[in-house]
Each structure stands twice: as structure tokens, then as C-alpha cells.
Amino acid sequence: MATPSLIPTDADRDHPVRIHRVTRTNRHLWYQLTVLQQPERARACGAGTKDSDRRPVDPPPVVELRIKEGNSFEEGKEITFDYNANFFLYASLEQSRRIAPGRMQGQPNPPILTGSPVSGMAYLDRPAAAGYFIFPDLSVRHEGHYRLSFSLFETTKDEKDLDIERASDDRLDTGADWRMEIKTSPFDVFSAKKFPGLMESTPLSKEVADQGCHVRIRRDVRMRKRDAKSNNGRDRREDDMARRRTVTPASEDPHSAAARARSMSNSSEHRVPGPPEPPGHPSAVDPAGRGHLSFGGPQYASPHQYGLQSRLPPPSPGGPYNPATQYIKPEHQSYRYPPSRDMSQTGPSPAPRQDGHDRRQSGPYVPPSPSVYSNDGRSRPESHPSYPSTPVSSHPANLPSDPSLVLPRIKSPSNSVSPSNSSLKITDLLVQPLPSSEPKLEVGSAPCPPPKTPIGSKRKHDQTFVQNDRALRNHQRQLDPHYNPVARPCSPVGEQYKRADGTYMYAKFSVFTM
């Protein structure tokens, strides 16, 4: 039996471990254990259901056993293959650093080594003629810093090979004798996220596998394959992002793009007019505006500013009032009378600007009735821009012969702006006068009519039926032209009819004879 002094106690040992034993027949046997392949890394496999996805210790530990007979190991005879006994090696796991025991006894730790901790000896010729213990299926449950401890056990078959201390016992012991122990170098057990991966199988593992031992051989480096795969995926994502950044849109037909823009727009009935013509272009209307009824005042703009005002931004509610650049709706208006017409003041009108996509110029257009009163004194932007259109008839209406029924013409301010793209004549804007024998009323001011409402929209209620917001004193009442008999007669006379805005028009009837 091996003496206790010969049992190795150094844990950090990479060198072979030897023991000496004397048998009953005075044979001197030498045993030598060498860890040919040290474990380097492992992945924690966990416990319970996680145990099914475990990774073995990499590389698999390989321990070599050699037995010699003689006075010394160097001078002894190799009898590893001739010695009649059975050997097996048992592996156990321990911490790489010894932990001092506490005063109180702690709870027993569950086993953290799983797999096949026992290996029988395999007689191989390579790399040398000896016995080898291979552990290809050892796994650790928890991460940490560990080392493996291998214990050699022998089952003797011949009585002459028993220890000398057991000479008095004539029968063989059916048990196994512990011979020696050897420990590996420390290795790390990583978690699944921190595990660097398995390495390629070592030449020793391949050589052992070639001789029939059950060792899993990896021909490629899984760690490098994983890194390359992740890098390739990242490169592909970067390439895709670069392509998305550098992709140029396909060229499309400008006509189809314009058609799509018109179809997506909700202003097909209201188009923004073109830019104004140069100042040198002759205007179609006299800038003084003498062919239209306009009660003068710096707070009222010329009626020919409608085309220009459609391109100006709406006024700010809190901003200063600028009569030169803003259109003012008819405000603070008293009675309205039809304007007079002067054909001598009308100039030739240039040809209207044609829009490539506008086909509404040929349709009829009915001018709306202007509002009589305004319910507030603030100016509001128009909800729809106005555009000139071809009137229903270009012939002037029949005017009454009584000059007393027509108010004198008042000149508008000289700074009035007339749009250059207007195709209307002054005669087209005139309204038939109202023949009445009532005395003329003195009015303080009367604004210009509101802009024409484009085809496809309706007049607002406040443009026709509006109340005055002036202060009423001395039992005064609102003067409504629809109901006031002083302003206009209550019922039409002759061939006249009353419109919704309070104006009277002549009706022509065909005479049939029987």
C-alpha cells in the first residue's frame, strides 16, 4: 500500500504524480499519473430543464497512467499492459481556492458537476504505449473558478499483487483500493452570455479518437465562426442602410406628377392666379376706377384689387391696419344704389391669361349680390380667392333715361391697384339701376362690392343679410333696405322683380297674340 508521505499534496501541479507500492511477493511497483490535456473553459449548464442544453468541459481532460516494476521508476520495467488489474479514475470538482470552514456548519451544497465523472482505462499505442483516462462528457452547472481532482482506484485480480499489509487475509477483497490523486490546473466556467465559444479539437483528442475512443471532434473553430457570422450580419445591415440612404427616386413623368398634384388638391375649383405682369404693361381698367361706383375714402381700396389680394397673406388679428395692402370687405355701409355707366371712360381690355389646365373660362358666370351691411368693423380674409371669368353677356344693360335716379360718380383714390390679368370690362360690372320716384338719400360712404364668388361655391349669409353695428340714438332703428319703404318701394312696379339682396331688376316678357 502506498505510504501517506508519497501522496501528493500540491494542488498547482502540472508534473506527473508517482507512488511506490510493495506487493506480497516483494515486487516493487511504481505508478505515475500525468494530465496530458488540461481543461481550459466550460459553459455553465444550469440545473433542471436547462441541463439538457449543456456544454462539456473544453478540451476534454486526458490522464495518462504508466506502471513500472523495479527499484526506481527510471530503472524500472514497463508493465502497464502486462499488469493484471482493473483501474478507473473518478473526477470531482472543487474550488480553485480553498475556503476556510466557518464556525457554524453550513448547508451542504448540491452537486455542481454533471455528466460522466468516471472513466475506465483505455490501452492505447499513441501517443505512447500506456493507459489513458478520457473524460469527454463533464459539465459544470454554475459559473466560477474551479479545478478537477482525479482519484485512481485499482481492483486487484491476483493474490500476489495484493499489498504486503494484507498477507494474513487469504481471500481477495472484492472492493477497490484507492491508489493516488492528481489535480488539474484551474479553469473558468462562464455563463451562457459570457462564454467565448468552443475551440477546435486538439491534436491529442483527434489522435485518441482515431484509435476508437469516444471523443467528439470539431473540425472548425466555433468561436471564430460565431464572430464571423455576427460580423457578416452587421456588415449586411450596414450595407442595407447605406443602400437605403443612397437610393435615388425613380424619374416620373411631369405630366402625371402635375395631374396627381391636381387630383390630390382640394382647390380644383379655386386656382391661384399667375404672377402680376410687369408695371409697363397697359392696364385694362382705368386706375382711377371712374367706371365703377366707389365712395371715396382712404379706408376703402379700389374694387380692382381683388386679383392682387388673393395672393396676399391674410391680415393678422392684432396687427396694424394697412389700407394700401389689405382688402376690406364692405363695412359700415348705408344704402346701396346702382352705379352709373360711362362708356367713354372704358378702355380696351387685353386678352386674358390662359391656364393650361383651366377649362372653366367658357362656362357662364353669375356675379353675386353684394352685402348691404357688415356685422363688425374688423376685416376678415376671404375664404376663397376670386378669379375673373367670362360674364354671361358682354352687352350693356338698358339704363333708365331719367338722370335724376343715378348718383354722381365718385372717384376712387389714386393709389388703387388694378390686376393686370383681369379680363372684365367696366360695363360687365355694372348693375341695372332702380327707377324710383323716391327722393335720393344722403349717404356718408358706400364701399365697393365684394369679390365675385367663383363657380361651385355659395354666397355666405352675412354677405347678403347683414345688420349694421352702428350706435342707434334718439329712438333710431336699423335701416333695412328689404323692409324700409323710404329706401325702396315695398312692391315692384311694372315689369320689375325684387332679388334676395333687395335690388330690383327689369323683367322682359314675350308677348303672345292669339
Swiss-Prot record:
Residues 411-448 are annotated as: PEST. Keywords: Cytoplasm, Nucleus, Sporulation, Transcription, Transcription regulation. A motif (Nuclear localization signal) lies at residues 40-45. InterPro entries: Velvet (IPR021740), Velvet_dom (IPR037525), Velvet_dom_sf (IPR038491). It holds the Pfam family Velvet. Disruption phenotype: Reduces by 80% cephalosporin C production and leads to an altered hyphal morphology. Residues 228-243 have a biased composition (Basic and acidic residues). It is found in: Nucleus; Cytoplasm. Component of the heterotrimeric velvet complex composed of laeA, veA and velB; VeA acting as a bridging protein between laeA and velB. This is Developmental and secondary metabolism regulator veA. The gene is veA.
